[in-house]
């Protein structure tokens, strides 16, 4: 009896569906691409239960002839190509003839189509088998209804994510297709709620506004360039409008949304040093080329392609963006970007002179958050009135409005700071230190291992020189204070209280529909550190208050960065999110390089560093200090030399 046999058509289609149809978003992508190929100008997507229960895609395209309806569900049946030559000269999004057959193999599908308004054709296919076919009244276009996805392959269901995640993927792919086809009007509705709507007027900026929000669309600049083989154009963001991942760059080749690492890298290279580390631009890059220069028959999903002359295209793209940005005034508007009441951050050094356990903090109302922040934070610098509406301070402190003094009057500001320091050190620190908890064993061990340093000097406003009995030490002042700050924030964020600082003007954040869905799905993670985002429209959120440990003047940037983590990393554990937040805040609040410290500030930092659990590295892993032993110094100055005689004897 032969062991090799041919698989049935039904089983073959189910196997093929495993490559083409991975999740509900795959179904939407294939059906919408078919609608685009059918020259539709309006495409509507209706979703129920994130697509697992129902997906319905309707268009006003050219429709399907009655004689071709049943054939369209056969594997490798297509109207897009006919010969081998056509395969290497593809001008349509679909061409493999697998989409309908693969979808019908794992779902219950009903298709209704008409080439002209009036009488059309309806076919019902379930699990790859035709259930019925008949004439039906229908307007011009095609309507495909997909129910009970993966009903006959239940093993696939266990690999599905949450409904919010699956819906986000659907919205993302439709948004990409909308940006690639701004002349087509798209709508996406989920359980009766409109999620995405684009105008279809052919204006790419207008389409971007409908997807990412008006503020992002306004921050885009257009560009275009061409050579003998390629024509590139599109919209890309100014350097100040960035995201934490590359996912907000959409590459479109001959109308097809693709993923290509080298081209994405070329776009980023066009910005040069204008982007901050870890930040990426947003934009839509349209690339037109001869179809013979691109091979789209690489993967069943057609998201990956092979490009001829890829290096040439990358260079053209980088230069086009570099040239366009060079024409822009990239100097930020000081009035728009200047942090509130923070013109000269003399108080950047925030020494932990009074380590507090959050458990010892008094219970306060949200409106008292600023007073708590000023009187009990580990950073004396924060006692300056930095908030738009500062809470009243204790009369005996008499802090004064130092920030309104001229920024060039540094000696007077230093004197005022010293007076304020003395008052705070005598009034605030003793009270707080009385309740300081006993250090744990790890802190004691770190203190014992850390050298007893005597401060000597500062070098280049960046490094501190100190000595001990065993030699010379050089410390990175930014890394050192990062570690001190991190120890505080790790404890403060780990024990979230109800203390909140209200904003005078609430912060409104606009996101794309896909991002808004993801944010709602992970809102509990944000709330675990005291950040509350309330719905404010379809794809917008409002923040009315924030934790008291936020740095004044950087509230919006801090919130956006924390939200970006959620969008980039997805479902993070609360512990991981708090850890990232502590690291971020410790860096934001640490003194930067090229900042002069007086002797008292430097000594205070060296005094506090040994109390850290790990005083040897900053939270990012960089070393805090390096050591030159007495022997090392003596060798460098040739005070210790190898004997010539011993060398000769050894020879």
From Swiss-Prot:
InterPro entries: DNA_mismatch_repair_CS, DNA_mismatch_repair_MutL, DNA_mismatch_S5_2-like, HATPase_C_sf, MutL/Mlh/PMS, MutL/Mlh/Pms-like, MutL_C, MutL_C_dimsub. One of its GO terms (molecular function) is ATP binding. GO terms for biological process: mismatch repair. NCBIfam families: mutl (TIGR00585), PRK00095.1-3 (NF000950). Keywords: DNA damage, DNA repair. This is DNA mismatch repair protein MutL. This protein is involved in the repair of mismatches in DNA. It is required for dam-dependent methyl-directed DNA mismatch repair. May act as a 'molecular matchmaker', a protein that promotes the formation of a stable complex between two or more DNA-binding proteins in an ATP-dependent manner without itself being part of a final effector complex. Residues 383-405 are annotated as: Disordered.
């Amino acid at each position: 009896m032969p062991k090799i046999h041919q698989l049935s058509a039904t089983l073959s289609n189910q196997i093929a569906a495993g490559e083409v149809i991975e999740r509900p978003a795959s179904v939407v992508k294939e059906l919408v691409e078919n609608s685009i190929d059918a020259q539709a100008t309006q495409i509507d997507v209706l979703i129920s239960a994130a697509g697992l229960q129902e997906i319905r895609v309707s268009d006003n395209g050219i429709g399907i002839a009655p004689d071709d309806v049943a054939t369209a569900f056969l594997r490798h049946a297509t109207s897009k190509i006919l010969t081998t030559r056509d395969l290497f000269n593809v001008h349509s999004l679909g061409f493999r003839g697998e989409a309908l057959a693969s979808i019908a193999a794992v779902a219950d599908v009903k298709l209704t189509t008409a080439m002209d308004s009036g009488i059309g054709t309806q076919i019902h296919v379930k699990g790859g088998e035709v259930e019925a076919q008949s004439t039906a009244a229908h307007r011009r276009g095609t309507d495909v209804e997909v129910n009970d996805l993966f009903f006959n392959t239940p093993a696939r269901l266990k690999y599905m994510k949450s409904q919010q995640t699956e819906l986000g993927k659907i919205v993302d792919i439709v948004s990409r297709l909308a940006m690639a086809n701004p002349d087509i009007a798209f709508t996406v509705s989920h359980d009766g709620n409109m999620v995405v709507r684009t105008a279809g007027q052919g204006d790419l900026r207008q389409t971007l506004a409908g997807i990412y929000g008006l503020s992002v669309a306004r921050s885009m600049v257009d560009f275009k360039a061409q050579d003998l083989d390629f024509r590139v154009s599109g919209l890309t963001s100014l350097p100040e409008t960035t995201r934490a991942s590359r996912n907000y760059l959409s590459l479109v080749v001959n109308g097809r949304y693709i993923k290509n690492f080298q081209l994405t890298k070329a776009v980023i290279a066009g910005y040069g040093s204008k982007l901050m580390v870890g930040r990426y631009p947003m934009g839509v890059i349209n690339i037109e080329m001869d179809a013979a220069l691109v091979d789209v028959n690489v993967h069943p999903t057609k998201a990956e392609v092979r490009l001829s002359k890829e290096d040439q295209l990358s260079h053209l793209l980088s230069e086009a963006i570099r040239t366009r940005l060079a024409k822009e005034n990239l100097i930020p508007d000081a009035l728009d970007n200047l942090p509130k009441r923070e013109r000269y951050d003399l108080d950047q050094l925030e020494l932990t002179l009074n380590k507090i356990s959050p458990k010892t903090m008094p219970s306060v109302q949200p409106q008292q958050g600023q007073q708590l922040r000023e009187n009990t934070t580990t950073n004396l610098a924060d006692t300056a009135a930095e908030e738009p509406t500062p809470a009243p301070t204790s009369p005996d402190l008499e802090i004064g409005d130092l920030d309104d003094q001229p920024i060039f009057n540094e000696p007077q500001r230093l004197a005022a700071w010293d007076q304020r320091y003395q008052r705070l050190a005598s009034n605030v620190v003793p009270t707080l230190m009385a309740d300081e908890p006993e250090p744990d064993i790890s802190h004691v061990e770190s203190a014992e291992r850390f050298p007893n340093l005597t401060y000597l000097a500062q070098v280049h406003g960046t490094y501190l020189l100190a000595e001990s009995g065993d030699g010379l030490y050089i410390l990175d002042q930014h890394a050192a204070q990062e570690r001190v700050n991190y120890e505080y924030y790790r404890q403060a964020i780990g024990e979230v209280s109800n203390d909140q600082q209200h904003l005078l003007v609430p912060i409104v954040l606009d996101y794309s529909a896909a991002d808004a869905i993801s944010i709602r799905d992970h809102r509990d993670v944000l709330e675990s550190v005291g950040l509350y985002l309330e719905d404010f429209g379809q794809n917008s959120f409002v923040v009315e208050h924030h934790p008291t440990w936020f740095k004044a003047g950087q509230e919006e940037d801090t919130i956006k960065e924390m939200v970006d983590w959620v969008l980039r990393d997805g479902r993070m554990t609360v512990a991981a999110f708090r850890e990232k937040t502590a690291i971020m805040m410790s860096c934001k609040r640490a003194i930067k390089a090229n900042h002069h410290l007086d002797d008292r500030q430097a000594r205070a930092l060296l005094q506090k560093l040994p109390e850290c659990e790990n005083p040897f590295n900053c939270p990012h892993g960089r070393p805090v200090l390096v050591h030159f032993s007495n022997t090392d110094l003596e060798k460098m100055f040739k005070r210790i030399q190898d004997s010539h005689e011993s060398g000769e004897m050894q020879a």
